[in-house]
Design a protein with these regions (language model features):
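Proteins enriched for Cys/Gly/acidic motifs involved in redox and nucleic-acid/cofactor modification
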Residues: 1-206, 243, 248, 254, ...
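Short, surface-exposed connector motifs at secondary-structure boundaries
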Residues: 7, 72-73, 224-231
Length: 436
């Protein structure tokens, strides 16, 4: 059965790499004649691109597919991504999914879906990761619901953090060929994209397996005509050398917003997590970045785990104090999720779930307080905004180069354009801005 006149709905969980990979799948299905439909509409095929960082992510994937199957009993349902790759036996038992496939099997998804639409029996296809495997090329020419483009430049992680299942889900570091990245970037620029996000599982590891490095890639991306803003995904602070920082600061097109992975602001907790930096070293990297930018503004975002095994109240308070010290624009706070197959699963002194949730709520409140202080310091300053979601004919949401969320009235402009604005007050969700 061909895909002509058939509809497919995608649901994406997790990181920007998943967004990129979903974009590639959408392109694949669109090329076969399928129509992409949003959530809530009837479809012939439902695909969830899963995230398995937490147990909650697995639960959301299963819940979404159950609902899709219940509301569309004749549809084909697909479970792909990190969940089935990391836990193939568990995912295979989830019978609401007609197709279960891992991260290395995405190129076969369309063919397998067409087989299922023609009456083929249920398919489970999860290929284990292997040493020496190559980067899977999944180019994307446009994204259905985004005005910024995401380019996947690397996959895999060689680290072994005590809490993390991602190396199991993503395999070893594999870097994408530079020529392939630049070719896709030029195509995206020709399609009208002005901002690109370089996404990866371990972004600073780019080039470790190919003899190049991330900063060289950024410098070459900045030479592509039509691309006005380059944004980086998550960075590990221990991999940012002074030379690396200095060279990045010299790239004018690079958005000066750095997502530096923290996980805890307490050094003893970081050691138990098997992170390879201390809180003090993290702060030094932040200082080096600020020094490299001089009087130019720079912002920092991060992730933080609450309730890691062995975390005392004093450790938690130390982590909170560190968040205030750095002055993060945004902190993604989440309670520790106990993942089977990771060293931390068997660690002693597991923190009770109620306490993890309580600490997460407290840290979230603190992070919002710090966010308000950071945004208050930007009132009256000017920046550029990429117009994104239109709220009306003239009102848009968007983000500045610093990743400050704004709402601005921009008559005569449209989504995807970059405009110059003056920042106003924060309303609890976005900063109100005005065209300059």
């Amino acid at each position: 059965m061909k895909g002509s006149l058939m509809r497919v709905c995608f649901y994406t969980l997790g990181c920007k790499v998943n967004l990129n990979e979903t974009g590639a799948l959408e392109q694949m299905f669109r090329g076969a004649g399928f129509t992409i439909v949003p959530e809530g509409e009837e479809a012939d095929v439902f695909v969830v691109n899963s995230c398995t960082v937490t147990n909650f992510g697995d639960q959301k994937s299963r819940k979404w597919l159950r609902r899709a199957k219940r509301e569309n009993p004749g549809a084909v349902t697909v479970l792909t991504g990190c969940y089935p790759q990391a836990f193939p036996e568990e995912a295979a038992q989830f019978m609401e999914a007609d197709l279960v496939c891992g991260n290395g099997d995405r190129k076969a998804i369309l063919d397998n879906v067409l087989k299922l639409l023609d009456g083929h029996e249920r398919i489970v296809a999860v290929t284990p990761h292997q040493r020496g495997e190559l980067f899977e090329e999944l180019p994307v020419e446009r994204f259905e619901t985004h005005t910024r483009a995401f380019i996947k430049v690397e996959d895999g992680c060689n680290r072994q953090c005590a809490y993390c299942v991602i190396p199991r889900a993503r395999g070893p570091v594999r870097s994408r060929a530079e020529d392939s990245i630049l070719k896709e970037l030029r195509q995206l620029a020709a399609s009208g994209y002005r901002e690109v996000v370089l996404s990866a599982i371990s972004l600073p590891s780019y080039g470790l397996d190919t003899g190049t490095n991330l900063v060289e890639l950024v410098e070459k991306c900045a030479q592509v005509e039509g691309i006005e803003r380059i944004r980086l995904g998550s960075l590990d602070p221990d991999m940012l050398t002074p030379e690396f920082i200095t060279r990045l600061a010299a790239v004018e097109k690079l958005c000066p917003q750095f997502h530096l992975s923290l996980q805890s602001g307490c050094t003893s907790t970081l050691r138990r997590m098997r992170r390879v930096y201390t809180a003090e070293q993290y702060a030094q990297v932040v200082d080096q970045i600020r020094a490299a930018y001089g009087e130019r503004p720079v912002s920092f975002t991060t992730d933080c785990i609450c309730g890691f095994p062995g975390e005392t109240q004093a450790d938690f308070e130390e982590s909170c104090a560190f968040l205030k010290k750095i002055g993060f624009l945004k902190v993604h706070v989440f309670p520790y999720s106990r993942r089977s197959g990771t060293p931390a699963y068997d660690f002693p002194a597991q923190v009770h779930e109620r306490e993890k949730q309580a600490r997460s709520r407290e840290m979230n409140a603190l992070a919002e307080e710090v966010r308000r202080e950071v945004l208050a310091a930007h009132v009256g300053t000017e920046d550029e905004v990429l117009l994104e979601t239109p709220l009306s004919e003239t009102l848009f949401t968007g983000y500045t180069r610093l990743y400050i969320p704004v709402v601005v009235s921009a008559p005569g402009h449209k989504s995807g354009e970059i405009v110059h604005v003056r920042l106003g007050e924060y309303d609890g969700e976005r900063v109100r801005a005005a065209l300059c």
